[in-house]
Structure formats: C-alpha cells, structure tokens
Curated annotation (Swiss-Prot):
Catalytic activity: Na(+)(in) + 2 H(+)(out) = Na(+)(out) + 2 H(+)(in)
Function text: Na(+)/H(+) antiporter that extrudes sodium in exchange for external protons.
Entry keyword Transmembrane helix: yes
Protein name per UniProt: Na(+)/H(+) antiporter NhaA 2
Length: 382
C-alpha cells in the first residue's frame, strides 16, 4: 500500500492535483459557514505579519527562489542554453505576455484603478500546465513538453521583471542600499568559490528582510539569491550547490508552499457577487486575456517565427498540438493570483474579481487544451 502514495507524489501531475485540491477547498470554505474562521485565520498576526502575508511574502520567496534556480540552470546548461533553443519559446513568451495584457487593457481602458491589473493574465502556471501534459502521457511528444517548460520559464522571467518594475511602492532607499550590499556579498561569495549552502541561505534571509522593508516586493529576494548559488563544481562526481538546493526545496514548494498559497488566495465568496460584478471589466479582461489572449499570442507568434525561418517547430509535433499547448498556457493561476494581490492590494472587491477571472480563464484553458491535445493527430503531416 505504501507504494501507492509514493507513486503519486513522484508523478509529474501530483503537484498540480494537490494545488487544485487546496484551491477547491478554499473556494468551498469561503462559501460555507466556515468563511469567517477562514478570514480570521488569514488575518491572524504572527510576529508582525498576518498569516496571509507570511505565505505571500515569505513562503512565496522560496517559490521564487526555486523559479530562479530553474531559470539559471536552463539558461546555462539546459533547454535555453543557446540562442537557437531560446528562439521559439522566446517569441511565444513575448506573444503570450503582450496579447493577454492588451486584451485586459482593452476591457479596462476607462478606469485608471483597474488598469493596474494589466499584467495579471500575462503569466503561465507551469505546475498546472505540465501537470495536464503529464496526464496525457505519450500522446504529447517530448519536444512539446520541453517547449512548454522553456516558454513557462521565460514567462516567469517576464513576470518577475514586471513585479520588480511595476508593483513597488514607498521605496526606502536606506533598506534598498542594505539589499544592494547583501547582493554584493553574495557576488563575492560566488566568485570566491564558496560551495556550502548555509552562508548563501543566511545572506538570503538578510536580503529578504531588506527587501521586505524597502518597498520592492520581498519575493524578489528569492530570485536574486538564486542567481548567486553556484551551478558548477570542480569535482564532476559531486552535485552542485544549485542542484542540491533545487532538489531539496522542490517537494516543499510543490506539496506545501504552493498548496498553502492556493488555499490562502483562491477563496472567493461567490454568494456576495452580483451578475454585474461577474461580468465587470476586471474578471472579463482577466478570463479572456488568459483563455483567448494566451493562445492567440503564443500560437500566432510561434507560427510567424517558424514561417519566417526565425525558429523551428518542435520535433515530431503537429501545428494542432502546438496550438493545444498554446491554449494550455492560459492556465495562469499561481502567478496571476499573485500579481492580482499586488495590483489591487487596497481593494478586496477587485481582488475577488481577479480570482473569478483567473479561475474561469484557467479552467477553460485547461479543459480546452487537454481536449485538443487528447484528440489531435499524433504525427505531423509531411
């Protein structure tokens, strides 16, 4: 019997399934008599921060560190190590961010307040999207899984840049200076060849504190720390510090941090919303940005890049399969909810509207993408 849970947790789809369960639980609780207790729990103050802030500002910094480790590994030695490998996912990521943002802006052009959410539909949830692909098994060629992974990594890079550049407020230059000194220390440690993880993690904790107090979102500390974790070691028989850290935190991020984030952020009280709320510019812009904008931007620029000879279609794939993956990328969830919380931090109603839009767009994208890939021909036409 013990083999069953072991097989489940080692499955590529496991993380997405656990995240779905946690998010569904949040929606159920938020629309039940337990709602008040749920809200009290999230607002409970512990060591100066609410539980919700500890999850979104501290635990999610660990998630962003894992994203940063993956980005560094793929850029230096993996699927994005050469310009040729970066071409198709690069064009696709560009279209997959620009078109959803444009659709959102089109629906919200009349309001300066809601325009702040333009980046919400620009992100892809790699855990969900790869989880759906895993459910389809061998029907999807390995090249498409690599394409989706590379695209999502570049998407994450764009989302991180957006958070750092556009969702900061009340900058404390003193704290920012402290963060800069800490980054310089990390650089020196890296150049000095220090391979023990503890000094890096200790400096990372200090960096997180400075970022939290600076006005730049604290999760950026996770990305910055990841950039300085050594990838290469002199002894080829030894695992690199980056690989050790990535393998060490992956299960915690997948099965604890992201489900906690989903439970803390997906709970929306639908009973308190009117039809006008559900069809207002924010949820409609987010949902259509994810479901329509993602597939149009990713597939459109992929087709254009291949047609112009700037990139190559993934091996052993059909254009219909590429389109199916483009639709799947409309699963925004984690990063979209995260950006929504930043964009509308002072407006709980707008945050709830974002949740509705993200859930609607992501569910449509998951179902449509899975159906397209399930029934698409598995061999490219000649």
């Amino acid at each position: 019997m013990s083999e069953v849970p072991s097989a489940f947790f080692s499955s590529p789809a496991a993380g997405g399934i656990v995240l779905i369960i946690a998010s569904a639980a949040a929606i159920i609780v938020a629309n039940s008599p337990l709602r008040e207790g749920y809200e009290v729990f999230l607002k409970y103050n512990a060591a100066g921060l609410s539980v919700e802030h500890w999850i979104n500002d501290a635990l999610m910094a660990v998630f962003f560190m894992m994203v940063g480790l993956e980005i560094k590994r793929e850029l230096l030695t993996g699927q994005l190590a050469t310009w040729g490998q970066r071409a198709l996912p690069g064009f696709a990521a560009l279209g997959g961010m620009a078109v959803p943002a444009a659709i959102y802006v089109w629906f919200n052009a009349g309001s300066d307040e809601t325009l702040a959410g333009w980046a919400i539909p620009a992100a892809t949830d790699i855990a969900f999207a790869l989880g759906v692909l895993a459910l389809l098994g061998s029907r999807v060629p390995a090249s498409l899984k690599i394409f989706l992974s590379a695209l999502a990594i570049l998407d994450d890079m764009g989302a991180v840049a957006i958070i750092a550049l556009f969702y900061t407020s009340n900058i404390s230059f003193l704290m920012l200076a402290g963060a800069a000194v800490t980054v310089a220390l990390l650089f020196i440690m890296n150049r000095a060849g220090i391979t023990r993880l503890f000094p890096y993690l200790l400096a990372g904790g200090v960096l997180w504190f400075f970022m939290l107090q600076s006005g730049v979102h604290a999760t950026i500390a996770g990305i910055l720390l990841a950039l300085f974790i050594p990838l290469r070691v002199t002894d080829p028989d030894k695992q690199s510090p980056l690989a050790r850290l990535e393998h060490g935190i992956n299960p915690w991020v997948t099965f604890l941090i992201l489900p906690l984030f989903g439970f803390a952020n997906a709970g929306v009280a639908l009973s308190g919303m009117t039809a006008d709320d559900l069809m207002s510019p924010v949820p409609v812009g987010v949902a259509l940005g994810l479901f329509v904008g993602k597939q149009a931007g990713i597939f459109g620029l992929s087709l254009l890049a291949v047609s112009l000879g700037l990139a190559k279609r993934p091996e052993k794939s059909t254009w219909l399969q590429v389109y199916g993956v483009s639709v799947l990328c409309g699963i925004g969830f984690t990063m979209s909810l995260f950006i929504g919380n930043l964009a509308f931090a002072e407006s709980p109603l707008l945050v709830d509207e974002v949740k509705v839009g993200v859930l609607a767009g992501s569910v449509l994208a998951a179902l449509a993408g899975m159906l397209i890939l399930r029934f698409s021909p598995s061999h490219p036409s000649r």
